[in-house]
Amino acid sequence: MPAFDIVSEVDNVELKNAVDNATRELATRFDFRGVDASFELKGENIKIKAEDDFQLSQLVDILRGNLAKRGVDARAMDIKDAVHSGKNFYQDIDFKQGVDTLIAKKLVKEIKASNIKVQAAIQGEQLRITGKKRDDLQAVMALVREGDFGQPFQFTNFRD
């Protein structure tokens, strides 16, 4: 019986490349010359540091652009509030890994409401979709791509 998994993952290598490119771009930008600003990647967390709140938003825009160039979906970013400490502003950005249980339930509900003849099962941080026809599975893929669930999804483990 054909099946596939719906997962939400961020490629850590591409994430590191995007942060490195953003750091290089930061070094060449005229408006950041002589400014204490930086990106710091630790695991799946990026810490941004700048001297001003406006510069912090500029750094987030630089990072978003570089993530898009590297093929990392910016919807996976979970941007925390800016923290002011001393003369610097800091902001943490986490990246969502895995399908959250609330979003998974929302996905299952959406799939069942579409009346496509498939079964959806939540398996930890992923969803397994099973159906009798490949066309039904492709219809579910299209449905998930069109829906706005606040998180990017990838389709893996397609079995026929």
UniProtKB/Swiss-Prot annotation:
Keyword Nucleotide-binding tagged: yes
A molecular function GO annotation: nucleotide binding
Originating species: Aliivibrio fischeri (strain MJ11)
Entry-linked Gene3D superfamilies: 3.30.70.860, YajQ-like, domain 2
Protein name: Nucleotide-binding protein VFMJ11_1323
Keywords, in A-Z order: Nucleotide-binding
Domain of life: Bacteria
Family listed: Belongs to the YajQ family.
A GO cellular component annotation in the UniProt record: cytosol
Disulfide bond positions: none
Keyword Nucleotide-binding among UniProt keywords: yes
Task performed by this protein: Nucleotide-binding protein.
InterPro entries per the UniProt record, alphabetical: DUF520 (IPR007551), UPF0234-like_C (IPR035571), UPF0234_N (IPR035570), YajQ-like_sf (IPR036183)
Transmembrane segments: none
